[in-house]
Regions:
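Post-Walker A alpha-helix
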Residues: 24-25
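Post-Walker A helix-loop "phosphate-sensing" segment adjacent to the P-loop in P-loop NTPases
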Residues: 30-38
Length: 199
């Protein structure tokens, strides 16, 4: 049975750093249920993070072993430093069980997911303006000016790439978090109802 024909729904949410996508994904999950896909990464774990909940922290050699065994639906190197990947098995199991599974990944990963799972529903979160995005990156207080400049330039590239192709099913401007969450929930519910009617 092809994974694309399953009753579950794979929701991919992308957007640049600072746009609020992770908060939106968690709020959608709180309201609609489902499972959050935990990505594997080679980056170091921060003190606040929990292995297996926030990320699966693996060594570069373990990541390469998993990649060579086709254990990832998608994988990418981010900011030229650390690798990230979406483990295949939990996603496939959730879809087989008819669940909603949520992925918070970048455009590179979304392109790979679209190739492997054309029925995935993909939403891109946009900032209300470049100025607001820059402000959000600055007020996070996590990085110096050079790192903020790098993230802002990467965010612009990601937005340009996402909006220049027919990869995403919907775009949501996050100018108000509650409205953005409402819109995401509405879109996902409509998609699930449409999928259920076809099944």
């Amino acid at each position: 049975m092809s994974l694309d024909a399953q009753t579950g729904l794979l929701l991919v949410v992308s957007g640049p750093s600072g746009v609020g996508k992770t908060t939106i994904v968690h709020r959608v999950r709180e309201r609609l249920g489902g499972q959050f896909s935990v990505s594997a990464t080679t980056r170091p774990k921060s003190l606040a993070e929990v292995n297996g909940e926030d990320y699966l922290f693996v060594s570069p050699s373990e990541f390469e072993r998993l990649k060579s065994n086709d254990a990832f639906l998608e994988h990418a190197e981010v900011f030229g430093r650390h690798a990230y990947g979406t483990p295949r098995e939990p996603v496939e199991n959730a879809l087989r069980d008819g669940d909603l599974i949520l992925l918070d990944i970048d455009v590179q990963g979304a392109i790979q997911i679209r190739e492997h799972m054309p029925s995935a529903y993909m939403i891109f979160i946009l900032p209300p303006s470049d100025e607001e995005l820059r402000h959000r990156l600055e007020t996070r207080g996590r990085e110096d000016e050079e790192a903020i400049d790098r993230r802002f330039a990467e965010a612009r590239r990601e937005i340009d790439l996402a909006t220049s192709r027919t990869l995403y099913d919907a775009f949501i401007v996050n100018d108000n978090l509650d409205r953005a969450v409402d819109e995401a929930c509405r879109l996902v519910s409509e998609r699930r109802n449409t999928t259920a009617l076809k099944g």
